[in-house]
Amino acid sequence: MTFAVRTGRVKEGNGMSKINGWHHLTLSTDGVQEDYDFYTKTLGLYSVKRTVLFDGVLPVYHLYYGAKGGAASTIITTFPFRKPGVYGRRGSNQSKVIMQSIPVGSADFWVERLNGAGLTAVKGSRFGLTRVMFAHPCGIAHELVENPADTRDPIVKDGTGITAAQGIKGIYGGAVSVQDRTAMDDFMTIALPLKKVADSSEGLMYEVPQTAGVVQMVEVLHEPGVPQGTWTLAGGTIHHMALNTGDEDNQLKLRAHIEGLGFTDISEQKDRNYFKSCYVRSPGGALFELAWTVPEGWAKDEPADAIGSTLVFPPWFEDRRAEMEAGLEPAAF
């Protein structure tokens, strides 16, 4: 979809932007054990929630990682699909890179650490920011970005060998590969809407509003020659990127705004137990989510000081607990 009027007509402060930072990023991976070890050991994140895929009938883990208390904008979630054997194809019109923020000056530490763990990591730069570029064991691109504007505390966990000088601070953003640069630019600045802060041969960059003052971004990479990637929940691909609306009122107002622009396939609100979600596909197909956390948050089914320590199911899956547990891929958590 391309809008009839070009970018720039939506003014900041018009009351339409209902976003306050990132909520989470979600990808479909391969093996459960390699996924869990990658995030909790190599990257030093905490296990925040261990549950199952709420959609469909396949017994698949849904694993959440982030800061110890599960703060919004630190959460990465995964669906490991090795046992079902469902795999996707990485390509254009799809989210391409998971980006997390690290302290300035820590890139060399991470290059050494990641290479030492058997993951090929190199230092690079895009939009003037130093990055460590590497991949999840299943092949999904990741970057650790030295973000001088990130005031969050680093995530530090005993036994990992990662200190406050190196710890990941949370989500920096995500990069999306597109074939149609103009249509995506319109979606980002008019539908969501986000402020465009860079437009160059490297791509487009949009700032995610954040009242805490943490600079977070969406990057759009123009790759017209790259074949279309898959949209389904399938191993080896990023499924969606979720923006935080803070509450239900903001979510529903933004949903109505997006639907009114012609995105009539934006989903109804879905109950994700810990948060409520609406999903919308950008013009090429990359999936975005609008989410807000319910008052109980991660402590809805576990003690607040023990989140992510047990396997939990939503109430509507309790009658399938034994069946689903038997069908899950074995792993040591």
Kindly give the residue locations of the regions a language model identified.
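Short amphipathic beta-strand starts and helix->beta connectors
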Residues: 79-84, 157-160, 222-227
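Conserved active-site tyrosine of GNAT-family acetyltransferases
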Residues: 35-40, 63, 114, 139, ...
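Vicinal oxygen chelate
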Residues: 3, 15, 21-30, 49-51, 59-64, 82-113, 130-135, ...
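Acidic, Ala/Val/Gly-enriched low-complexity intrinsically disordered segments
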Residues: 4-5, 10
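Extended intrinsically disordered, low-complexity coil regions enriched in Ser, Thr, Gly, Ala
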Residues: 33-42, 47, 94, 150, ...
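Surface-exposed interaction/gating patches
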Residues: 165-255, 259-264, 282
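An N-terminus-focused feature that recognizes amino-terminal "leader" regions
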Residues: 17-85, 92-99, 107-108, 112, ...
